[in-house]
Amino acid sequence: ETDTGMLFDVLLHVGTLIAICAVYYKDIVRLFVEGICIVRDVLINFAALIKNLFLSIRDRGKDHVDYSPYRRIVNSSYRKFVVLILVSTIPTGIIGFVGKDVVEQASELLIVPGICLIATAILLFIADRCKGGDKLPKDITYTNAFVVGIAQGVATLPGLSRSGTTITACLLSGFNRKFAVKYSFIMSIP
């Protein structure tokens, strides 16, 4: 690929990122804040774990030991949203890393983008006909998020629409239509 082609791809992705940030800026800020709070609570729980281990060793044999309580990490829809995005990112990263050479070779064959464009059309047809569901972050399982991450990883093939693939995967997993679109675009940021 030429430098001009690479520059075009980078600028295209930057433009998409700017558009996503403009549309979902309130959600992105809230997700960022909740992500920081998740890290804080994990560190507090780790400190409580160390303290409780020390207390259990020190106070072995006593009838009552005053253990430190643990904080619940995923205690809101936005925190669940953050964790779901992280779960979706794992298979995407693995597929992207492992399949890098396959994607590069597939880009050189005209038949692959052609087949993938047809696959995109079929996926968009399915998404249009799919009733979807009513799942919001609190109802979505981590398995659902993992499957959507796999769909995003597969969508690195040339000609396969990333958003079309992930929105279809979301709808087939029972996501609410509006949330499926939001999830698809926000999960493209990391």
What are these regions (language model features)?
Residues E1-P190:
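Multi-pass membrane proteins that catalyze or facilitate reactions on polyprenyl-/lipid-phosphate substrates
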